[in-house]
């Protein structure tokens, strides 16, 4: 959801973008009005709660924080000196009210001037035909510490405490409804008139296993294709998890690569035939790691054509589960890349790398911005497209990550920064210990790109595909390319920016501790770069505000 408010002269405006768990506020001010501007003071109100000023982690020179326990000061005392601000203390389906004030005066006595007010509602994750939900996972560690201080201290002291021993509230907060969305999709198959076809890399979380077994027990036609690499530990665990299903309901995908799919097709049975109704896909493996620890997405489409393409691919693998070559030939022939359509479902393995070329073309076609979260091992063509040319005019905000390493890109490939992936205490210390020996080396497992987020014609790439050569020609993978859907782009874009801002903040927090970050400017000099023609900060100010 997007809301734009401006004064009658349109020399002061605020554009808001709402995702599922965040709101982004982008401000713009005409150049003559920036004289003496100390920043923006932002108030927030929701429900029947009082209006409150949002906090700033920076203060004016020589000023102590008014809330030292949070290392923060309200923004009417320490105005926010940036033209974009994100609020991630947001729940799905909630209406938020914001007031953005211009702050002038002096560092000793800021004076609030003109203000703009807006209301915006976060996505509830339940739109008619397409919904996405993200767990909170690692990038919510600061909020976790504030919400569950006792548990945070407990898991700091006992890093091997199993997540099953956690209080329900903390566990549910971490998965953020993602597990319920998975289970709810399975439960839509109510009886023998329904079928569930499941393609999964890691089938190990008991809550999901129990939900699938319950569907089978009520007569649902269940088939499970699972990763079955010879001599592989995951294969052994998958087969143990499938013990209650008969052999006719399960087949191992025998591969020397990875059966990396994680999708479920829901079909209605009519005349003995499956009539596909919906598909659940995304990046989430059916493990504690996938649901609670790694950052992941579940994407549900109530789209019969897309569900049919997933079912066709499932049927091909089901028919010849030990013949990866046959699948590769079939996908190459029957799933040609057609990324120009509004909604495209792609699969691999395929020959020739057409999927990778399509990704490069989409990224290179971006006119305004590129948001991304990826792994490190990318083909040069993909990496060069994501990072662009030094000092080009495309805004780039992204992360490359493993469990131990985070590299971020701030507006331009020349502004690379590195942040600590996991701290040693609290939720992150627990995650660090509990991800040891886990399959998969990504902390942020969501694999997604959004191009031209700030425009009315964004493009989203999302799925299990990690943009690598192996994902193109070796692994079984699936992905979606979605064009022109601003509502969906807001959900993905805000989530990618949440990861980005979390690690950007961590990078600055470290510099702050080392006294390498300047305090707030006591005058309007902080605005200078935002008004230099062609500077990336100027482009950011204009584009995010809808200019």
Can you say where each PLM-predicted feature lies in the sequence?
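PLD/PLD-like phosphodiesterase catalytic module centered on the HKD motif
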Residues: 1-168, 179, 183, 194, ...
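Beta-propeller domains
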Residues: 331-398
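Short, Φ-rich (hydrophobic/aromatic) sequence segments
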Residues: 186-189, 314, 362-364
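Aspartyl protease catalytic domain
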Residues: 140, 145-173, 305, 309-361
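Structural motif
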Residues: 199-202, 228-229, 372-377
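Short, surface-exposed alpha-helical recognition segments that flank or form part
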Residues: 75, 169-177, 199-200, 347
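Short, compositionally biased low-complexity segments enriched in polar/charged residues
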Residues: 173-190, 202
């Amino acid at each position: 959801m997007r809301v734009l408010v401006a004064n009658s002269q349109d020399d002061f405006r605020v554009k808001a973008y709402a995702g599922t768990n965040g709101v982004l506020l982008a401000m713009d001010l005409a150049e003559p009005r920036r004289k003496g501007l100390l920043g923006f003071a932002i108030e927030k109100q929701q429900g029947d709660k009082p209006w409150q000023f949002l906090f700033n982690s920076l203060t004016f020179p020589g000023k102590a924080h008014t809330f030292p326990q949070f290392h923060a000061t309200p923004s009417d005392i320490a105005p926010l000196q940036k033209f974009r601000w994100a609020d991630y203390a947001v729940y799905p389906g909630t209406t938020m009210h914001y007031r953005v004030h211009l702050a002038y005066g002096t560092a000793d006595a800021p004076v609030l001037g003109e203000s703009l007010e807006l209301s915006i509602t976060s996505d509830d994750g339940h739109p008619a035909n397409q919904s996405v939900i993200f767990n909170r996972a690692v990038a919510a560690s600061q909020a976790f510490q504030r919400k569950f201080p006792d548990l945070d201290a407990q898991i700091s002291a006992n890093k091997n405490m199993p997540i099953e021993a956690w209080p329900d509230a903390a566990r549910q907060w971490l998965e953020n409804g993602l597990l319920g969305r998975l289970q709810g999709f399975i439960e839509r198959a109510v009886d023998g008139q329904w079928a569930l076809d499941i393609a999964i890399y890691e089938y190990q979380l008991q809550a999901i296993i129990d939900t699938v077994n319950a569907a089978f027990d009520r007569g649902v036609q269940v088939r499970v294709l699972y990763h079955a690499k010879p001599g592989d530990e995951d294969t052994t665990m998958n087969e143990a998890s499938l013990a209650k299903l008969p052999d006719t309901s399960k087949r191992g995908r025998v591969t020397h690569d990875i059966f990396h799919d994680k999708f479920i097709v829901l079909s209605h049975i009519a005349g003995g035939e499956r009539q596909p109704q919906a598909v659940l896909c995304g990046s989430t493996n059916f493990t504690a790691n996938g649901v609670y620890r790694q950052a992941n997405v579940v994407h549900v489409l109530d789209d019969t054509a897309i569900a049919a393409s997933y079912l066709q691919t499932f049927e091909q693998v089901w028919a010849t589960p030990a013949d990866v070559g046959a699948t590769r030939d079939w996908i190459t022939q029957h799933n040609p890349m057609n990324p120009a359509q509004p909604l495209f479902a792609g699969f691999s393995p395929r020959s020739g790398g057409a999927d990778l070329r399509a990704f490069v073309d989409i990224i290179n076609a971006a006119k305004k911005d590129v948001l991304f979260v990826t792994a490190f091992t990318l083909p040069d063509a993909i990496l060069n497209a994501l990072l662009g040319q030094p000092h080009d005019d495309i805004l780039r905000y992204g992360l490359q990550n493993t469990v131990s390493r985070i590299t971020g890109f701030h507006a331009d490939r020349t502004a690379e920064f590195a942040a600590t992936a996991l701290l040693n205490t609290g939720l992150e210390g627990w995650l660090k210990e509990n991800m040891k020996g886990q399959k998969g080396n990504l902390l942020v497992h969501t694999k997604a790109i959004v191009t031209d987020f700030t425009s009315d014609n964004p493009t989203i790439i999302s799925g299990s595909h990690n943009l690598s050569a192996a994902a193109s020609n070796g692994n079984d993978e699936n992905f979606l390319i979605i064009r022109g859907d601003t509502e969906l782009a807001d959900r993905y874009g805000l989530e990618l920016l949440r990861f980005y801002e979390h690690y950007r903040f961590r990078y600055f927090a470290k510099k702050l501790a080392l006294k390498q970050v300047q305090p707030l400017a006591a005058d309007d000099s902080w605005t200078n770069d935002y008004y230099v023609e062609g500077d990336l900060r100027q482009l950011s100010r204009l584009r995010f505000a809808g200019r």
